[in-house]
Regions:
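Amphipathic alpha-helical repeat scaffolds of TPR domains
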Residues: 1-12
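Helix-start (N-cap) detector for alpha-helical repeat units in TPR-like alpha-solenoids
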Residues: 3-4, 38-39, 72-73, 106-107
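Residue-level recognition of tetratricopeptide repeat
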Residues: 11-12, 46, 80, 114
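Structural signature of tandem alpha-helical TPR/SEL1-like repeats
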Residues: 15-29, 50-63, 85-97, 119-131
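Short, charge-rich amphipathic alpha-helical segments embedded
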Residues: 30-46
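Terminal, low-structured helical/coil segments at or just beyond the last alpha-helical repeat
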Residues: 110-140
Length: 140
């Protein structure tokens, strides 16, 4: 109950005040009340990622994935982070899983394509990009 309130306050720190430090303090408070609160781990990870604190962000996403291996947001955001820090194999594994968990997510297919291109899999990358493009066309 209270952990959720701190999560919401953390989200407001980002959306209203653009204050990442205050947001992280609220996510930490939520996690002190409920260490298994996956949404708080993910939001903290995203906030750290956006602040370019990649090591700490990856630790948050790793915790979230270990708590719930089939959580799309946890797997997708860790894959996105791994692509950013050039852990291409890790990114490929996560983004492949993310596209399986949520096949309708265009962004996951696009990033999966980007990761595949980095290891020279141009044909597979093009397939993922085409899927992303088709999904975006459907939405508009």
């Amino acid at each position: 109950q209270y952990a959720h309130e701190y999560l919401l306050m953390g989200n407001e720190c980002i959306t209203q005040a653009h204050d990442a430090r205050a947001a992280i303090a609220n996510y930490d408070k939520a996690l002190s009340l409920d260490p298994n609160y996956i949404d708080a781990w993910i939001r903290k990870g995203i906030t750290l990622f956006n602040s370019k604190e990649y090591f700490d962000a990856e630790n948050c996403f790793n915790t979230a994935v270990s708590l719930h291996p089939a959580n799309f947001k946890a797997v997708y955001n860790r894959g996105k982070l791994r692509l950013k820090i050039d852990n291409t194999e890790g990114a490929i594994a996560d983004l492949d899983k993310a596209t399986s968990l949520k096949p309708e997510h265009a962004g996951a297919h696009e990033l999966f394509g980007d990761a595949l291109l980095r290891v020279g899999k141009e044909v597979e990358a093009a397939i993922q990009w085409r899927i992303a493009e088709e999904l975006r066309k459907k939405k508009s």
